[in-house]
Amino acid sequence: MTGKITVNLPHSHDLREQNVLTHMPDGETISTVAEAMKLLGDPSRLRIFWILCHCEECVLNIADMTGMSSPAVSHHLRLLKSGGLIESRRSGKEMYYRAAETELAQALHRASEQVAKISCPDAPIPEDAHTPQNQEVSL
């Protein structure tokens, strides 16, 4: 953030507030982070993203794994791809999807794993949960 922010808070306890405001990301950065998190705010998209963090899959298999229709899966995949969280490749007539190999996608995957672990400590989480396999699937 550029520039110095000076603010008179109703309850000024010490210089912490000024330090926090000086290091706070700008509005555009906050909006970018919020948009990325909003993408995973839908349980279906989070489920699809989680699957794709662990393996590469086609629409039909994702639909079967999630109990969703192929058109619904395709809709969610478009949103995740436009948000930069997943990527795709074509093999013949089939499109395969996987988590993007970006810091953002990896960070959101780790965050979702941690929240699941904290919220549902008895839920099984695969040992390789933090290592995307991105395996090719032959049909």
Regions found by a protein language model. Name each.
Residues T2-T32, E101-L139:
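Amphipathic alpha-helical dimerization/coiled-coil segments
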Residues V7, P71-A72:
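A composition/secondary-structure signal for short, hydrophobic, low-basic-content segments
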Residues H23-P71, M95-T102:
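N-terminal helix-turn-helix DNA-binding core of bacterial DNA-binding proteins
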Residues G41, V73-H76, A111:
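Generic structural signal for conserved hydrophobic packing positions in ordered secondary structure
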Residues D64, H75, K81-S82:
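Alpha-helical residues within the helix-turn-helix
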Residues K81-S91, R98:
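Beta-hairpin "wing" of winged helix-turn-helix
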